[in-house]
Amino acid sequence: MPNKGREMLKTDYVFQATEEPRELVRLQMLERIFDAGTQRRMLATGLTTGWHCLEVGAGAGSIVRWLEQRVGPSGKVVALDTNPRFLRGSSSSTIEIMQGDICDMELPLATFDLVHARYVMIHIAEYRKAFERMLRCVKPGGWVVIEEPDFQAARAVTGPEESRLSFGRVTDAIERMFTSLGMDYALGAQLPALFQEYDLSHLTVEHEGHLSAGGGMVAQLMKLSAEQLRDKYVATGKVTEADIEQYCRLADDPDAWAIYYATVAVTGWWQPQCSGPA
């Protein structure tokens, strides 16, 4: 099935220009670390056969393929991504791949039983507009599951002093990189209030600080990100090449512990002016 829509520019995805093989590795690492939690949250909504689901920012496609198995042939999964380069071959009678930006795509209104996005809104300066677009797609009585990072939580706990200082400077560079694009590097912390503001109810809020020793999955994920975004980090003026090297050494050191960031996940029920799910 051909991709639909047109590629938009509202989302300044910081990994857009990275080398395809390394970006696929990074996305697959995200899947290995976080898919189990994402799937648990989705199942808690009552996800079942016949549901129509929208996956915003489909990445390497693991959640899309998992949803296909859950909803079955009577259901529908729409996979939206600004660059669906890693979704080739995922189309089926159940899965529809769309290329575009959630802020501008003309998606069917009040259609989906479940809308999900993971690590998407942090890359969108107009994240409220993106959220509103998602809500417009949800059926009355449908569910929204959003998972976003909070880099404000990051800090080195143990390890050589030089590496810990460099870790702090890299975190400052991450903040500057996002804020220079009009984005919030701690967006995850804003999610619960955002869901309340838009009158979603029956909220479930989870906060997980990713404390990892060097060599752990999260540490290696952030090392790979630092290597891919090295030029962007240095361009902020907050770090040097040497700082990034020290950060990567700490991420490899099994005796060095750090909170690399936190993830906030919020699930909410969308039914304006109604008391709650049956």
Descriptions of predicted regions:
Residues 10-35:
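Class I SAM-dependent methyltransferase Rossmann-like catalytic core
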Residues 32-52, 66:
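Conserved alpha-helix/loop element of class I SAM-dependent methyltransferases that forms part
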Residues 54-105:
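Class I SAM-dependent methyltransferase SAM/SAH-binding core
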Residues 105-114:
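A short acidic, Gly/Pro-enriched loop at the edge of an enzyme's catalytic core
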Residues 113-128:
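A short SAM/SAH-binding and catalytic strip from SAM-dependent methyltransferases
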Residues 128-143:
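A short glycine-rich, Lys/Arg-flanked "PGG" loop and its adjoining helix->strand segment in the class I
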Residues 145-216, 231:
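Conserved catalytic/acceptor-binding region of the Class I
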Residues 184-186, 201-278:
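Conserved Class I S-adenosyl-L-methionine
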